């Protein structure tokens, strides 16, 4: 499903881990941005006709044979171009400058000496000042292309910021998109709004209207099936579709018995009572848990759950009959093409819950969120009037509690884990911490320890608690709970949940760990 955007910033991705952050920063200004891999950048330029282009960073070196380049048409289109890190080096190499391996690498915090006034620095940095930026480079520019001048230097980069003001070409060795460059967002805003002259009129209200019109045009009078999990992505998808096509939509909520406490009741109440959406609730807990009983391999757990989900969803869809479209809550990061210096770009489109269903059932896909990041989806949810408790709900994995129960899965262990998890989240909400934490949950370890309760000896499970802060889930830090909170929560779990006699707290960040345990 495509929606049109008149003023777009095109971001050419050379494989940087923070390319998505550039797009999100631009969107936060109220300007639409789109990412394309360097291999298909020329097609993106012809299709999108952008008002400005940003060249991303990269793990590659311009000195390597076959390293990525931008289409030369980028520099011939007569539009503003901003190069960031590797993007700066690519711009210089392609326009006649020179890049060499640096004698002094710069990683982390650095200071930029502002040498000249520039439209990029207007109202942000003054000539002669020293400004904190974030660097991550080994190579550096050593000779400028014709028409360029130096506007900023650093200890390890004599051409840390350069510009050709006549052609509106700007390039920086540092990363303005990361929070560690305190004024980076203002610099990007100067480039997008002042230099490129793009109006910041992209909003969720406008996107909502465009998406509804696009859904109606694509779907017509046909029926649509939507898999509902209760998470923010599927919830926003369902409400947006219902606003567009009303009773043509049927939602299916498959309860696999591995969800959080009271989650099924909360989902049913919201969508049946508040939105009057036709919703089929399938209680398939016995089927899933029986199939998982005794399974210890985390990958087999995921595959078993995925296979059964497809079987249940397929069976329920056949009962409805006549549906031509399957709706998915696919987000923009799921469809952005990954970048490889050699070979074709690879597009990741499958969704862990319904992957393979459209082909098996001869249905067409409708993906109204495929142009949005997670924070865009939350904004759209507010625009649609979804309750905050659903919009701010912590991420929850498709396989549910099965992957928070390392070792063999049993019905008893899932119930123990569900109760412990509910207590932990209850204490987090009481302490006013829920919205400060990206994700929090309990894990039931496949370990039993000796304990003493009353006059008796116990031999019961260990419960681990996990809480992390994050912006996008790509990296995460553990949340520093105070000892009073942990002591209070541990006491409740041990006293109220039969089967647990010890509680520990996970203080691993990502990397090196992952957020989930399996």
Curated annotation (Swiss-Prot):
Single GO MF annotation: ATP binding
- Which ranges carry the Glutamine amidotransferase type-1 domain? 8-201
GO CC: one term?
cytosol
Instruction: Identify the EC number(s).
Output: 6.3.5.2
Active-site annotation: 85, 175, 177
Is-annotated flag, keyword Nucleotide-binding?
yes
What keywords sit in the KW lines? ATP-binding, Glutamine amidotransferase, GMP biosynthesis, Ligase, Nucleotide-binding, Purine biosynthesis
Asked if the keyword Nucleotide-binding belongs to this entry, the reply reads yes
Catalytic activity field: XMP + L-glutamine + ATP + H2O = GMP + L-glutamate + AMP + diphosphate + 2 H(+)
The residues that the entry says bind ATP are: 229-235
- Please name one Pfam family that this protein belongs to: GATase
User: Which pathway or pathways does this protein act in?
Assistant: Purine metabolism; GMP biosynthesis; GMP from XMP (L-Gln route): step 1/1
Indicate the segments forming the GMPS ATP-PPase domain, all copies: 202-393
Give a short account of what the protein does.
Catalyzes the synthesis of GMP from XMP.
Subunit architecture: Homodimer.
Q: What is this protein called?
A: GMP synthase [glutamine-hydrolyzing]
Q: What is the lineage of its organism?
A: Bacteria, Pseudomonadati, Pseudomonadota, Alphaproteobacteria, Hyphomicrobiales
